[in-house]
């Protein structure tokens, strides 16, 4: 497995970055193929909120709306690791059909970074696309798009910019910028960039994170409430080994003031609720 670089922290730490709750606790594979009728029913029911709950209204064009409307692979699609091997057959949640999860360094924090950065790039909010490496160096997309490139001395881990090429705001160049961020950022650095949520409710786009080595993170991609005002949330994640982005097939009741949250692959503790 290719090692993600944490600067100047031990480089191999990211091999443990999202490897919680294993030892047989992962969702079991469903070894069957859905019929056309079953697939149609499953598509209608997939990701539907629990009885008595309705999805909250989201303004078109917002980050929340972007996350709610992520393109999904067909019902019953397999969930794949970055190398093409199958993690879960006929995944009962949803597999996001997006340009992520095909590179070895595209892990849990990177999934959150990618979704946030992609929305900002699509809405041309280029100046807001910036992420820190683990040593605190700020990688600015605007400088990258203008032709500057980031250089790293791997003996001292000093980073600097230099003007190396012409300006280019294309997706190809944007993706190359993200590949570098994925290599040198992680849950430890991402957590420091986010604001702690002090209230009792989350918004779509909020992040659940325990930064560290190991660490893990998931992102809120939808929200529903009942007549009592009680909220439930839909969560998505990347993982280690790198994989496609998955949306869990369950809604979570989350109160950030309760300092413990159990998800299928990770127990979050402390001030885990954050916001961009």
Q: Model-predicted segments: where are they?
A:
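Extracellular-facing segments of soluble proteins and assemblies that are Gly/Ser/Thr-biased and enriched
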Residues: 97, 102-195
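...with weaker cross-activation on analogous glycine-rich loops/strands in unrelated enzymes
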Residues: 168-228
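Conserved "cap/hinge" positions at secondary-structure junctions
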Residues: 211-212, 237-239
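Sec-dependent signal peptide recognition
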Residues: 2-10
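C-terminal motif of bacterial Sec signal peptides marking the signal peptidase cleavage site
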Residues: 16-17
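Low-complexity, Gly/Ser/Thr/Pro-rich intrinsically disordered linker/tail segments
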Residues: 238-276
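Cationic-aromatic interfacial patches
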Residues: 23-99, 106
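Short, solvent-exposed secondary-structure boundary/capping segments
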Residues: 226-237
């Amino acid at each position: 497995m290719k090692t993600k670089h944490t600067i100047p922290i031990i480089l191999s730490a990211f091999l443990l970055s999202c490897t919680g709750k294993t030892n047989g606790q992962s969702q079991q594979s469903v070894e069957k193929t859905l019929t056309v009728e079953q697939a149609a029913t499953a598509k209608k029911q997939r990701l539907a909120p629990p009885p008595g709950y309705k999805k909250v209204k989201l303004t078109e064009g917002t980050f929340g709306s972007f996350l709610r409307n992520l393109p999904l692979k067909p019902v019953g699609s397999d969930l794949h690791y970055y190398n093409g091997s199958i993690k879960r057959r006929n995944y009962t949640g949803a597999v996001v059909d997006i340009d992520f999860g095909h590179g070895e360094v595209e892990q849990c924090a990177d999934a959150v970074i990618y979704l946030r950065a992609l929305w900002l790039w699509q809405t041309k909010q280029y100046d807001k696309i910036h992420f820190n490496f683990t040593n605190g160096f700020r990688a600015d997309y605007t400088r990258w798009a203008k032709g500057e490139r980031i250089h790293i001395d791997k003996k001292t881990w000093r980073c600097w910019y230099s003007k190396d090429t012409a300006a280019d705001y294309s997706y190809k160049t944007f993706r190359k910028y993200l590949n570098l961020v994925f290599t040198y950022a992680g849950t430890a650095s991402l957590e420091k960039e986010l604001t702690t949520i002090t209230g009792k409710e989350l918004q779509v786009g909020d992040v659940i994170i325990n930064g560290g080595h190991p660490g893990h993170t998931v992102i809120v991609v939808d929200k529903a409430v009942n007549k009592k005002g009680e909220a439930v949330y839909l969560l998505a994640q990347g993982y280690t080994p790198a994989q496609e982005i998955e949306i869990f097939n369950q809604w979570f009741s989350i109160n950030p003031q309760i300092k413990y949250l159990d998800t299928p692959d990770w127990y979050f503790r402390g001030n885990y609720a954050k916001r961009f």
